[in-house]
């Protein structure tokens, strides 16, 4: 039964984060070496081109983990622990970049305080950090409303609809919204679904039967197809910066469950080799 439990996501959460970090690393650093336009080249190119989906996996498991944290600690402790976990490394990176990018003191503080993230471009300095810190800051308020909802799935769906309406309104009615900013706001849906899954993990057990696994595999396959459609073909799907939204949403949720199952199989059936692989991903997950 354990090998088909949704709680596998929680058990292998660190390893899933390690895989996400590895995929992001491929996106930034991997050089495609196969013969151009061969089948292997196309596979390599796709894996590299879609590597930013690892970010969505991070948003998903972050939302999931925050539910446990907010229930375990006071609000003050919650904020302090989140800040200590992520900000010091971000600040030190900013110091290092002062010397490589010739920042003055004002530019440095505008970057490490996240001001430029909101006023100029999200890609000024490790955009994920000010993005996730923003969500950490707002999470307790959101979770307060979430906890009071009688039907949390319906509540999450309503927030989804509100997000979609605001996204389309910003693009089509307000206009002049920085395109790069959608790279952040399009990750909000996966974060709030992570919160929903975290709540489910805390309260009840869900066992995946064959139909649920088939549905999960189908959802992952659909995400891969949409990633090809948006990231490789460059087509739009519903919202601006589509490749950072619906494709990665499906990949992050379904892929996380499939990864958890794979890690469980490695842990169960390939004791020696499996432990080595799991240790590598665990180290990457902790480091990330």
Show the residue positions of the predicted features.
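Alpha-helical transmembrane segments and terminal signal-anchor/GPI-anchor hydrophobic tails
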Residues: 184-188, 202-287
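Interfacial loop-to-helix transition and helix-capping segments at the boundaries
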Residues: 43-55, 117-131, 170-193, 225-258
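Membrane-cytosol interface segments of multi-pass membrane proteins
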Residues: 1-169, 207-213, 257, 268-284
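Transmembrane alpha-helical segments that form core, pore/gating elements
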Residues: 192-198, 203
């Amino acid at each position: 039964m354990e090998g088909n439990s949704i709680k596998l996501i929680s058990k292998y959460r660190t390893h899933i984060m390690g895989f996400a970090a590895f995929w992001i690393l491929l996106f930034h650093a991997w050089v495609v070496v196969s013969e151009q336009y061969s089948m292997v080249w196309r596979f390599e190119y796709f894996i590299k081109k879609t590597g930013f989906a690892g970010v969505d996996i991070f948003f998903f498991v972050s939302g999931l983990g925050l539910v446990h944290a907010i229930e375990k600690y006071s609000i003050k402790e919650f904020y302090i622990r989140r800040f200590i976990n992520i900000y010091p490394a971000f600040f030190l990176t900013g110091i290092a970049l002062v010397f490589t990018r010739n920042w003055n003191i004002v530019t440095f503080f505008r970057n490490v305080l996240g001001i430029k993230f909101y006023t100029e471009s999200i890609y000024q300095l490790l955009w994920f950090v000010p993005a996730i810190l923003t969500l950490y800051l707002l999470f307790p308020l959101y979770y307060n409303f979430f906890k009071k909802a009688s039907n949390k799935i319906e509540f999450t769906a309503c927030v989804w609809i509100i997000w979609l309406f605001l996204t389309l309104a910003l693009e089509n009615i307000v206009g002049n919204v920085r395109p790069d900013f959608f790279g952040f706001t399009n990750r909000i849906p996966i974060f709030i679904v992570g919160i929903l899954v975290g709540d489910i993990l805390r309260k009840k057990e869900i066992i995946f039967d064959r139909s649920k696994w088939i549905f999960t595999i189908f959802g992952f396959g659909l995400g891969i197809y949409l990633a090809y459609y948006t990231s490789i073909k460059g087509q739009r799907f519903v919202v601006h910066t589509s490749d950072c939204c619906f494709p990665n949403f499906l990949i992050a949720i379904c892929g996380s469950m499939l990864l958890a199952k794979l890690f469980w199989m490695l842990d169960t059936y390939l004791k020696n080799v499996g432990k080595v692989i799991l240790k590598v991903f665990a180290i990457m997950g902790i480091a990330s």
